[in-house]
Amino acid sequence: MQKVGVIGTGNFGLALANLLSINREVLIHARREEIAEKINTTREYKGQVISEKVVAISDFEEITRECKLIFPIVPSSNFKEMLVQLRPFLTPEHILIHGTKGLHIESDINVVEELQRHEVLTMSELILKETSVVRVGCIAGPNLAKELSDKQVGGTVVASRYNDVITEGKKALHSSIFRVYGSNEVMGVEIASVLKNYIAIAAGMLEGLGYGDNSKALLITRGMAEMIFFGKAF
């Protein structure tokens, strides 16, 4: 069975690599060779014990040669830079399923009112724009890295316009401790993944100000309605 790739050695990237290792051998890409060596030598990084089925590398060409299914798990601020380095080795045969919560702004303009729709891209749109890859998707859900690394029961949504992307994502990720669901509404999933963070922050602010569950429930329900409005406009 072919290896699966993960790009990014942050907490979520490491946790995802361990989850994938239940079903597959995994290559995880580290930005620096010394990080890859530490993972391979100590089998531990950032407080997480790394599966023996996970091998760390620092070569983009190798990960694209060995893996047709790749999960880029890097911050949105670094996502385009990563794609620029990766794209010489990508082909339309690859599948990229990202786990990045964020939007890419194509302009240097900082005033939100002046932004145009074509200047704001989801990570899937950015992949399509910057690479030759056609089959793209994202994963999103209650995916706290600490709980995943502790092997607590969890789940995620694999979203893509292409059913074979969803199928490949499910086959790679699904296990007795991790449920995987599919959706063809990739843009809706990406937008919700971004906007829910603001609602979560606001809920924490309400609690800090001494407000109770009624206020938080109102915030969450109206926040969800606003997410829907935003999604329709997007």
Question: How would you label these PLM feature ranges?
Answer:
Residues 1-50, 54-59, 85, 89, ...:
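NAD(P)+-binding Rossmann beta1-loop-alpha1 motif at the extreme N-terminus of oxidoreductases
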